[in-house]
Amino acid sequence: MTVKRTSFPSDPFVSSANVLAKAVRAARTQAQLTMADAALVANVALQTLVDVEAGRAGVSLAKLLQIADALGVSLFVAPAALREEVRSQIQDITNAGDDV
């Protein structure tokens, strides 16, 4: 089965559940994993992954981190005062990777 690839959010700042949902979906589709396969890889129920990719509330932080880790999505913590600097640096690194 071919999985339609989606792209990561253009802004690395996770401002909502929907932004994180888009990143998880992008990681899964770029790995050519179906939702069922990704749920197996992440060791979570399929419905949990469905809820995450839909941006639904109610998924525990532990499960969300488990899914993100299994799919290779990294989350970073930075003080709000450094948000724009960190955002800019991550975008620069991401853009440099696009040129390779």
Show where each model-derived region lies.
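N-terminal flexible/basic segments that precede or flank functional cores
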Residues: M1-V19, L82-V100
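Residue-level signal for the short linker/turn that defines the boundary of a DNA-recognition helix
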Residues: K22, Q32-L33, V59
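Short alpha-helical DNA-recognition segment
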Residues: L33-V50
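Conserved beta-strand edge residues that scaffold enzyme active sites
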Residues: A42, A81-L82
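DNA major-groove recognition helix of helix-turn-helix/homeodomain DNA-binding modules
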Residues: A62-A78
